[in-house]
Regions:
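A short, N-terminal amphipathic alpha-helix
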Residues: 48-56
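Short, well-ordered alpha-helix to beta-strand connector turns
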Residues: 11, 26, 86, 117, ...
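Canonical Radical SAM [4Fe-4S] cluster-binding loop centered on the CxxxCxxC motif
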Residues: 1-45
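Flexible mid-to-C-terminal extensions adjoining Fe-S/redox cofactors in radical SAM and related proteins
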Residues: 32, 228-250
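Distinct, well-ordered alpha-helical segments
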Residues: 74-81, 99-112, 131-137, 158-164
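Alpha-helix termination/capping residues and helix-transition junctions
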Residues: 23, 55-56, 114, 168-169
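Radical SAM enzyme [4Fe-4S]-AdoMet core and its adjacent flexible, acidic
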Residues: 125-236
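Core AdoMet radical
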Residues: 13, 31-44, 57-72, 85-103, ...
Length: 250
């Protein structure tokens, strides 16, 4: 950063890319190329970074992503144990079917760490890109949980209601996501021409909008199930001049 740092109360969200890859090849993933050259990735380096960020912003949020955080439970446990309880912790995962680690082991991990994990976000898309663990397994995750669904390119809009019913059965909230590689400051809040927003408003009850300059959320209800349509910029910093005349990295 070249300017003074400014962020929301509590500090910026810190994203931790776990130092091991996943077995997936989702077409909208922008992280896969980073794991092709992961020589500098290590649990030890991440532990040092966690300590640094805790000192700078002792109440910031941590988000584990990848890669696949649940591909190495021993390493994930070490990283979780290093985060003080002043922070909220989120995990993005496919909760995968994977060799060497059963669904029961992953469920037990969530039970042991239910006091450390704020929410687990499980990827389940309209189009299947990976071998998914059964919905009944997802429902057994011991922490608060949410399903993330990227509505990518020519997604099957006529399946949206069935998808909502699928998760209403377990009362698991749903977050539909725009392809964030296509999000810009100009279209972040642009509603005209937003096909996803139109498809959702056509099928579900629109409840309102919240957000900031970096991201937003359109909220919907379907028979008591809370759903969100989320858009976010593909980068974490914007440069802006404040009312005091000082230029900040935000």
């Amino acid at each position: 950063m070249t300017h003074p740092y400014k962020t929301r109360e509590g500090g910026a969200t810190v994203t931790i890319f776990v130092p091991y890859d996943c077995r997936n090849h989702c077409p909208f993933c922008v992280n896969k190329q980073e794991y092709a050259h992961a020589e500098g990735f290590s649990v030890e380096a991440i532990l040092k970074s966690i300590a640094v960020m805790d000192e700078i912003t002792p109440r910031c949020d941590f988000v584990f992503t990848g890669g696949e955080p649940f591909a190495n439970l021993k390493a994930l446990q070490r990283m979780l144990d290093a985060i003080p309880t002043t922070h909220k912790v989120y995990i993005n995962t496919t909760f995968p079917v994977q060799p060497g680690c059963s669904a029961e082991e992953m469920i037990a991990f969530t039970e042991r760490n239910r006091d450390k994990i704020t929410c687990i976000n499980i990827s389940r898309h309209l189009t299947k890109y990976v071998e998914e663990s059964p919905d009944e397994v997802v429902a057994r995750i011991a922490t608060p949980k949410r399903v993330n669904c990227v509505l990518y390119m020519d997604y099957p809009a006529d399946e949206l209601v069935d998808y909502a019913e699928r998760w209403r059965k377990y009362n698991i909230p749903v977050q539909f996501r725009y392809d964030y590689t296509e999000t810009t400051p100009e279209n972040l809040y642009q509603e005209e021409g937003d096909k996803i927003l139109a498809d959702l408003k056509k099928r579900f009850t629109y409840k309102g909008l919240d957000g900031c300059r970096m991201r937003n959320g359109y909220h919907f209800d379907y028979k008591g199930l809370h759903m969100t349509y989320h858009k976010t910029l593909p980068y974490s910093t914007i440069v802006e001049t404040g009312d005091d005349g000082v230029t900040y990295d935000i």
